């Protein structure tokens, strides 16, 4: 039956036998005959040229589903990027070549477009790479992987899980502190959620997505920050040994797979209150220090000061 409600009739050219359905007024093909189809010619007609390719942004929000952009073709000035985003010069050797890659150019192009359109992006431009400013690649000792920045204004400042002083620690950070106090019961309880004291000791607090639209978690996953972060982690793994990786949740564990013969790789459920496994029992902070002690290296002071 067609969309008008009339019975669908098939000619004898396409069937050898017609049967009427018992339950509906529809003619059913009992022995359909296959039609011969003409193959479409391959390639473009002579003289036809296509415009330069554009890429559709499959954003999680419908607001950007119709937006397109063309990849940057001009050479990206790494010095300019380092200056604009306040990236520490200590990271130049590790990041400069990667920032010239076409995908990285696309990230910054789209980031600028969003800013110019009036979108409120967190954290501020100067804090997106704040994780580079507390220690250089050769000083990294512990790597903790997060997902994307807190989407609430005033919270995110470029360090995974950390919030600015004066901000009430979010639930995930409270669970991290609970595990910390379980491991070190004599430690002074944290009075704020700023983890800069960890970062200064070589704890890399790195989100896999470096920006977010205010109020919309996961909104900037499509930009491609994850690829840049994976390259950073890959180079750290290749150039260093003896690092401690704390991979909390499936997302972090899929982001990087360090060689356990060269590094200490610790896994646990995410500290989110929605996790089925309580984070309070996570002993990663103690295990990291035990690892450093065996190597004759100083421990990390996990106090939040």
Swiss-Prot record:
InterPro entries: UDG_fam1, Ura-DNA_Glyclase_AS, Uracil-DNA_glycosylase-like, Uracil-DNA_glycosylase-like_sf. GO terms for biological process: base-excision repair, AP site formation via deaminated base removal. Belongs to the uracil-DNA glycosylase (UDG) superfamily. UNG family. Its EC number is 3.2.2.27. NCBIfam families: PRK05254.1-1, PRK05254.1-2, PRK05254.1-5, ung. The active site is at residue 148. Excises uracil residues from the DNA which can arise as a result of misincorporation of dUMP residues by DNA polymerase or deamination of cytosines. Therefore may reduce deleterious uracil incorporation into the viral genome, particularly in terminally differentiated cells which lack DNA repair enzymes. GO terms for molecular function: uracil DNA N-glycosylase activity. One of its GO terms (cellular component) is host cell nucleus. Its main location: host cell. It is an enzyme of class 3 (hydrolase). It is found in: Host nucleus. Keywords: DNA damage, DNA repair, Host nucleus, Hydrolase. Disulfide bonds: none annotated. It catalyses: Hydrolyzes single-stranded DNA or mismatched double-stranded DNA and polynucleotides, releasing free uracil. This is Uracil-DNA glycosylase. It comes from the Viruses. It comes from Varicella-zoster virus (strain Dumas).
